[in-house]
Amino acid sequence: MNKRKINNKVLLIIDIVLLVISIFTYKYIFEVESLKKIYSEQTSRFIEDNENPVFRIGKIILYSSANAVDKSNGELKDLDISQFTDLEIYIDNKVKSEEITAENTINQMYINNIKIESKNNSGEKILNYKNPLECGKYVELDNWKDDGILFNIINTNEKNEQADYNNSIFYTDCSNPISLGYINKNILIGCEVGEEAGTIVFDGTILKNARIDLEKLEAKISFSINIINNYNEKFVCNLEIENNLESEGEGIYSGYLIKVLNPEEDQYNFIKISD
């Protein structure tokens, strides 16, 4: 009799253990399947959102030249030489819709994850916003701050009337390019240019006169452009731009160099990362 009671207790305990295991197994399987479903839905939505992007980079214009500061009272015996490249980045916000909407207009924009890689450590590498009205001219710039480059968005007539292009501004409808300036400052200090060089102009020709190897000035400029639209949705585009100063002919040695980059379709789409 006692043996039967013990067996019954053992069977009851086994049944309880099996029940608990079954519950946890079902819960695990249910959670895994739920996560799979959520992941699948999110993936499908991500693909759908980015197959027809709201924003993309439509065009990039690079203007490169050089400048020198003469510290020898015009005798060209003590020149500090710098190279600069202006970047005009155009955002196309009419891929998905030709109409101006809350979805394809900008409420906030900033640039971060800025990185400049160069084959040469000479000079101070600087990147920051540049007044677009100064494009093509050498202008001293401060380097970017730790938090990147924050843009003031022009979205009213009043702000438009008060717009100061010396500050980092961008129009909500993407009607102006993102204007940036890159400077490789003081790549050569205390340089003397001989009379055999002839007439000296402080532009890209000064690099040739100073015998500066263009290959050593090549740089890879990369950064992320972050956009928040007027639906409060966030988008990001990671750019990588090669600052190559050579081209057919003399390149920047001829005085200046203009390059127009037309990215391939889907190369620089803004990826939607949050609703």
Predicted regions and their residues:
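Non-catalytic macromolecular-recognition regions in eukaryotic signaling proteins
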Residues: 29-217, 231-275
